[in-house]
């Protein structure tokens, strides 16, 4: 049997720039058995797919000069994994920066303030140039020791023949330091020979402060980058904390509370009202309504009875439940989602890949240019001091401060701006790629709509007031546990309806209806089919109910003693900002598609109100991922949703955007999270992404243009022609200015108005979706053959792996598998024998009992 390829996660240490992650990725990719490797510098993580042993992978990383450790995957290790994601780097860098500044400020005062502006200094140093040089040497040495990590990483990478940005920082700072030490010795010699002219000349050639300034500026950039890293892992840490910590199990006929890791398959556990389900299981006693919003994104509670399945992290809103554990530990749905999100953590922004390539060429090229510059000037007869100064100027002016800061600073500011407005970009790639969206797929419930049913219309019959209708409906529905009842109760509370009607003989009748007695009158409430059994419904009210239904609303009929008293319409209403948000997206040239499981009539009504371009109705949760896959054939797709049934689609999409009011699982399966649950934040996120990407391009353009102009100038290319030569001091100043320009440009993002649609521009590569609609219809017409398979042994959603097996068969177009129903509906374009279907399922260790 061929080894099964799996995704394994590793924590990587010692990486400092894009060149580091590229080297680790290259080293691991060369290991036999590794089919895919992705290293994320932002999360210091690595995802590896293949059959290679973890010890071999770790050794490959260590041979490349870095460290690696395999991450835990068990549910009980979630807290330890979350601890691994804790931001420890930022406090260390902040401490290094503050300490460096404590020595840099007096160093700059002595070197720049006194020498250039004649600021006062202690009398003991006045005129004592050697002492001034020694103090500068001391301060610089201390700063270099504080920031020794640059030198360790830089020279270690150079030793491994893979120079990175730290290498240039180390070489530039060390070259300045070495040159200044040489000048200090030369000045000391001149003073010993009483050559004061030479002493004064040498005094102005100290560059200790530049050596220290390089390290301090890079530390600023590293700290900004570390802060950005810390924020991108917040969502993953929240997901890990969502895992239940304890459960109440029955042992020796007693209820005892145990740690979640002590719950085993087959254990009996109990859940009281208001408590979360600890593990996946089956109800063996009791019934209740479960709020499954933690898994489905739907806020309406789902009725559960004996034999129904329950999932970890869902909330028991009412009723005492006794359940048998079926999936525990890493096998629960929640744990599988945690693992899925962890697998997706090792991603890389496209612009980081560009940085990898540039770094691999830029660093060794600059070193070669510096060496070549020195040799050429020596060959043309210049002094060693002149040649050395030109070489140092090349190293220093091309110090990749601007290049290193261009992306992380812009991303840091962009992320900060987003966070300030409730828009969280989980990674650099999400911030970069969101603005390139061509198609937006919107889940209806909780995204376009509020996700909470509300009363929209009250239509009493003649002779009955709205207050009377609402009072009777309130009295009847307050005893109901039906999800739509809460909408009527909320409306009654808003209307200050008092509890002055008492219901007796209350019965929840099968068939979506309620009945009871108020005094001597029998009242009924429910759908049209139910009420028609007990009261005559006028034709005008039937037409009104159809009109309400066409608007995407659910009409509830109420009757009293065989007389209809009115209709109350309930609907999951559209959010106030949804139509405007859709319009803004369309003005950007983005096609907007709405996905919903509703029937076509309701879906079109809501789609019309929202103003979307296309409506795809009747989409089952597992079908959303398939729709997104089809849309991706037309262009770059962003999926917006709020529940776990959106998670596969969020993952399949080029960019997954989660509404914050949804589940933590959906949030962590997505790339962007809208904390305020406003659809208008979707176009805002796209604007911010575009602005940030533009800012990064501006920063990189400046960084490269600066180097293209600065390196030849520093090398003395214009010296023979125009007499221009660049003093290393001005090279350092230029380098500092380049970094300042990059940071300042990035800070401009703080002024960006992300909710201002007046400057929106349409994308040039907008797509046409009519063909996809036609193709989808054609595919539905082609599915003329269907077979329903009854399957035993499927206990949870993970058992639906048979879907992939069936869909891999030639002639099978789609397989819709339900573990709850114990069925698989197979749609075929060609005949597939029952024997083949049966064998395919039974190869997965399930039993086929019947095929219709």
Report the location of each language-model feature.
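Flexible metal-binding regulatory segments at protein termini and peripheral loops
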Residues: 1-133, 143, 229, 254-255, ...
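Conserved ATP-binding TGD loop and adjacent catalytic N/P-domain core of P-type ATPases
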Residues: 2, 22, 35, 437, ...
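Conserved cytosolic catalytic loops of P-type ATPases
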Residues: 31-55, 205-206, 237-331, 429-473, ...
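Transmembrane helix-loop-helix hairpins at the membrane interface
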Residues: 92-246, 357, 458, 723-728, ...
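ATP-driven catalytic headpiece of P-type ATPases
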Residues: 93-95, 314, 438-442, 448-481, ...
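Juxtamembrane coupling segments of multi-pass membrane pumps/enzymes
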Residues: 187, 196-198, 212-273, 304, ...
């Amino acid at each position: 049997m061929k080894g099964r390829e799996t995704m394994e996660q590793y924590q990587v240490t010692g990486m400092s720039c894009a060149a580091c992650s590229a080297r680790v990725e290259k080293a691991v990719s060369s290991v036999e058995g590794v089919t895919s490797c992705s290293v994320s510098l932002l999360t210091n993580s690595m995802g590896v797919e293949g059959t290679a042993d973890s010890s071999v992978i770790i050794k490959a990383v260590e041979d490349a000069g870095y460290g690696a450790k395999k991450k835990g995957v068990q549910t009980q290790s979630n807290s330890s994994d979350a601890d691994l994601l804790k931001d420890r780097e930022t406090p260390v860098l902040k401490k290094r920066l503050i300490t460096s500044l404590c020595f840099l400020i007096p160093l700059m005062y002595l070197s720049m303030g006194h020498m250039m502006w004649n600021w006062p200094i202690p009398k003991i140093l006045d005129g004592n140039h050697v002492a001034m040089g020694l103090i500068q040497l001391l301060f610089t040495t201390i700063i270099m020791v504080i920031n020794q990590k640059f030198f360790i990483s830089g020279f270690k990478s150079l030793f491994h023949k893979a120079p990175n940005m730290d290498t240039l920082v180390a070489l530039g700072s060390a070259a300045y330091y070495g040159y200044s030490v040489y000048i200090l010795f030369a000045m000391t010699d001149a003073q010993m020979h009483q050559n004061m002219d030479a002493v004064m000349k040498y005094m102005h050639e100290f560059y200790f402060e530049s050596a220290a300034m390089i390290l301090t500026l890079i530390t600023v950039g590293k700290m900004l980058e570390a802060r950005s890293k810390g924020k991108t892992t917040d969502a993953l840490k929240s997901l890990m904390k969502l895992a239940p910590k304890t459960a109440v199990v029955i042992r020796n006929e007693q209820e005892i509370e145990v740690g979640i890791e002590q719950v085993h398959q087959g254990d009996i556990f109990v859940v009281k009202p208001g408590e979360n389900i600890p593990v996946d299981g089956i109800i063996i006693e009791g019934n209740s309504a479960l709020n499954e919003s933690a898994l489905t994104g739907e806020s309406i509670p789902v009725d559960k009875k004996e034999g129904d399945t329950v999932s970890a992290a869902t909330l028991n809103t009412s009723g005492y439940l006794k359940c048998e554990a079926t999936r525990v530990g890493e096998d629960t749905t929640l744990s599988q989602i945690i693992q899925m999100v962890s697998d997706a953590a090792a991603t890389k922004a496209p612009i980081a890949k560009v940085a990898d390539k540039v770094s691999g060429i830029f660093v060794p090229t600059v070193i070669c240019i510096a060496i070549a510059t020195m040799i050429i000037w020596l060959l043309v007869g210049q002094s060693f001091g002149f040649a050395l100064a030109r070489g140092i100027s090349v190293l220093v002016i091309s110090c990749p401060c601007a290049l290193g800061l261009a992306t992380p600073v812009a991303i840091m500011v962009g992320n900060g701006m987003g966070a300030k407005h409730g828009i969280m970009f989980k990674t650099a790639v999400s911030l970069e790629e969101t603005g390139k969206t061509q198609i937006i797929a919107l889940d209806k419930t909780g995204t376009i709509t509020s996700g909470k049913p509300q009363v929209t219309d009250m239509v009493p019959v003649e002779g009955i007031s709205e207050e009377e209708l609402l009072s009777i409906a309130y009295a009847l529905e307050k005893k109901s546990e039906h999800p739509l009842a809460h909408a009527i109760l909320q409306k009654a509370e808003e209307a200050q309806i008092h509890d002055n009607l008492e219901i007796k003989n209350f019965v929840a009748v099968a068939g979506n209806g309620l009945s009871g007695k108020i005094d001597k009158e029998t009242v009924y409430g429910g759908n049209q089919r139910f009420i028609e059994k007990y009261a005559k419904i006028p034709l005008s009210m039937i037409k009104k109910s159809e009109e309400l239904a066409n608007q995407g609303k659910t009409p509830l009929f109420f009757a009293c003693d065989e007389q209809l008293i009115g209709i109350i319409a309930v609907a999951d209403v559209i959010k106030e900002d949804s139509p405007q948000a859709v319009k803004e997206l369309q003005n950007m040239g983005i096609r907007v598609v709405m996905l919903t499981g509703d029937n076509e009539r309701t879906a079109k009504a809501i789609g019309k109100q929202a103003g979307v371009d296309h409506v795809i109705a009747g989409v089952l949760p597992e079908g959303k991922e398939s729709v997104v896959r089809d849309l991706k054939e037309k262009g770059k797709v962003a999926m917006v949703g709020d529940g776990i049934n959106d998670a596969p689609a969020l993952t399949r999409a080029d960019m997954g955007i989660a509404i914050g009011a949804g589940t933590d699982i959906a949030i962590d399966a997505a790339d962007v999270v809208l904390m305020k649950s406003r659809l208008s934040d979707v176009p805002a996120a796209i604007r911010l992404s575009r602005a940030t990407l533009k800012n990064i391009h501006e920063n990189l353009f400046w960084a490269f243009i600066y180097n293209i102009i600065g390196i030849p100038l520093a090398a003395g290319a214009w010296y023979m022609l125009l007499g221009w030569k660049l003093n290393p001091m001005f090279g350092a100043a230029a380098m500092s200015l380049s970094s300042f320009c990059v940071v300042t440009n990035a800070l401009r993002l703080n002024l960006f108005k992300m909710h201002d649609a007046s400057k929106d521009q349409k994308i040039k590569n907008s797509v046409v979706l009519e063909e996809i609609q036609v193709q989808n219809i054609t595919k539905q017409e082609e599915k003329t053959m269907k077979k329903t398979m009854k399957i035993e042994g499927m206990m949870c959603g993970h058992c639906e792996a048979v879907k992939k097996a069936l869909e891999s068969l030639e002639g099978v177009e789609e397989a819709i598998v339900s573990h709850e129903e114990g069925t698989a509906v197979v749609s075929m374009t060609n005949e597939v024998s029952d024997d083949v279907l049966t064998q395919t399922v039974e190869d997965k260790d399930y039993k086929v009992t019947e095929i219709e």
